[in-house]
Structure formats: structure tokens, C-alpha cells
Amino acid sequence: MNTLIFGIVFGFLLARYRFCFFSGFRNLFYFKDFSFVSALSFCIFLQSLGLFTLEYFKLITIPEFKFSILATIIGSFAFGIGMAFSKACVSGSFTRVINNSSYLITAFSFAFSMALFNGIFKKYIDIFTKNELTNIHTFLNISPFILVILLGILSIYLIYKAKKISILAIVLAILSLLMWKMIGFSFTLSVPSKNMILYLVTNQYRYLDSGVYFLFGCILGGIVANLKSFSLQGVSLKQGYFSVIGGFLMAFGASLASGCNVANILIASAYFSFQAFIFLPFMLFGFLIILRRVS
């Protein structure tokens, strides 16, 4: 039940305040608008400070797992391409399913494809996933608080560029830290979307885990936030195709990179996962290549 409530709040906040990776990065590169990246970096900094403080007092355990560099590079690049095609990120699609048919198509395509890549196609995904690296501070054998300070300096610079402090970033960071303390993990969408499809298809309750409840809550929170703008506007056949392709590519990328933009950028960056800092530049590379051609 706790994860459902956290999901509702998370989905409501993202939908109500339009916290979207697609529009945020698009606005940064096209209009030099630093609002989103400023809020994102500030949220990551606050989470990082809170996470390592909680770990220092032995109140939580920060995850540490190895990952494949090649799989992350390929996956993040494919994810960025998919985000550009669908004109939405994963979180934006799930929290705005009643706003536009393209979001609904993207969300369904992503969830269904996640089930495929973790089902009959899993053996092909596993070819790329040879574990190699872990978290940055562990690899460098330094205190994580050194990296927290550097992240704080970057956040201050981006806040200066944006000329404002995001209250939403503070709220999301607090929400994330509460989830870590109460549940043991934070915001997650990719694996729960796979499990949601498997539960709906098989009716096996083993798939109905806390992550699925979080995703259900996220969708519900987005619906509540967007009730006044309920539309389900139709989309062109071309954008419909792009939404299907985008959802498929984002699922392929998330399967290889062990998570979507939320898990890898918003959350894993806060505990300095090498994977997160490899994911971001290659995702942006794929995103920008296609965005210029489909805009």
C-alpha cells in the first residue's frame, strides 16, 4: 500500500508540473532553457546528500551492483532514439495517458516490449550483459561525499543559469528519500511495467509486486492531475507509428541498460552509479540525432 501512495504522489507531481525528460532536454538544446536540468541536478544532489547521510548512520543500504559498459552504451543510445521518436519519455507517457493518444500508445508499446525483452528475447539481451563496473566512489576508493560536493557545485551553477530554484526538485528528493527509508528502493518504472503486463496476461500474483503498485499509483496520480485536461486527442498515422517504435526502442534500451531515464538518471545518479553517468551522454546523443530529423 505504501508504494501505491508513493506512486500516486510521484505521478501527480510529474504530471501537474510537467517534469518531463523529453521536453526538458529538447528545451535545453533548442531554446537554451536550463529550467529542467537545473531542477534535475538539484534533485539528484539533494537525494545524494540524503542517501549517503542515511547510509553513514546505517539507516539504509545503498545498492551496489556490476553492469555491462557495452550493454549500457547500446541501450542508452537506443533509449534516446526511442524518446525522440515517441516525443515523450517513459515517465511522461505513463503520467499523461489521458492527455493524448500518442502517450497511451507509447506507454503500452513500452510495457509490452519490456515483457518481450525479459521473456522470449531475454537470451539475446543477455549476450550483451557482461558485468564490468560498479559505483564510481567504490571504483575510485574515495568518500562519496567528495562527489556529493562536486555535484552540489554543478547544481549551484545550473541554478544560476536557470535563475530559479525548483521547489518540485526538493519535494521529489524528499519523496525519494522517504521511499528509500520506508521501502528500500526508489522510483522505478521499467521493471514494474514488464511485471504489470505479465500479471495482466497470466494472472499470476507473483508478478504483482511493490513495483507494480508503484506504477499503478504513478498512472493514477497522472490521471488525477490531468482530469481537467482529459482529451485523448487523436494522432496522425505517422506519429502513431513513431510512438510504437519509440516505446519499443525505449524498452530495448531499458532492458540493456537495466532501467529507463528515471531509474538511471533521476535515481542511480544520486548514488553515483557508473551506469547512470554512461547512460546520460549516450542517451542524449541518440536523442539529438533523431530529434533533428523528426521535429
Annotated model-derived regions:
Residues 1-295:
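Membrane-interfacial helix-loop segments of redox and metal-homeostasis proteins
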